[in-house]
Regions:
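Short, basic, low-complexity termini and linkers enriched in Ser/Thr/Gly/Pro
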Residues: 1-5
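Conserved N-terminal subdomain of the carbohydrate kinase-like
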Residues: 8-9, 19-31, 46-127, 140-145
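Active-site metal-binding loops of divalent metal-dependent hydrolases
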Residues: 15-17
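Short, acidic/turn-prone active-site loops that include or flank metal/cofactor-
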Residues: 36-38, 80-82, 153-157
Length: 168
């Protein structure tokens, strides 16, 4: 992809890199690479460089981080902590537009407190992937006036932190 001399700004994506178990009428995937920050960065990389800030557990397969790196995603700010990786389990019916959450296990994600490194604080585009809305707000306070920020959430946070979501 040519950029015709246009300087591309790095996108900062902060949030979930996970292991997902997904069941559809067409099959099931167990502990597949998942998470909002993962899916966002895999897509956004076609348009601009992406740096991911996330936490995974010591059980997170190294092949998943290797895949993200091969896609050109900066994973230098993905920390590996003692404990289990965030897991989500869901089910889709024939209408693949909506999922039913079967289980959410926060694990190391429950204590995730992202610190944005100086080289990422000037990011003009910030994607707040599926994380606690209070943490999303703390990330916004660490970056210097992004031109655009977007917030992803899910039923887990909508049910437990609705008031915090309104402040994002």
């Amino acid at each position: 992809m040519q950029n015709h001399g246009v300087k591309k700004n790095k996108i900062l994506a902060v949030g979930s890199v996970a292991l997902d178990t997904v069941k559809t009428p067409f099959g099931k995937a167990d502990e597949a690479l998942g998470g909002s920050a993962t899916f966002f960065s895999a897509s956004a990389r076609f348009f601009s460089p992406v740096s991911v800030v996330a936490v995974v557990g010591e059980d997170f397969p190294k092949k998943h981080l290797a895949l993200m790196k091969r896609l050109g995603v900066d994973t230098a700010n993905v920390s590996v902590e003692k404990g289990r990786t965030f897991r989500w389990s869901g089910e889709y019916n024939f209408d693949l537009n909506s999922a039913k959450t079967l289980k959410t296990e926060l694990n190391v994600f429950a204590t995730f407190k992202p610190v944005i490194r100086p080289e990422n604080r000037a990011s003009k585009v910030v994607f707040l992937a599926n994380i606690d809305p209070d943490i999303q707000q703390s990330v916004l306070k660490q970056v210097h006036k992004p031109s655009f920020s977007a917030c992803d959430t899910m039923n887990y946070w909508i049910g437990s932190k609705k008031q915090s979501l309104w402040r994002c």
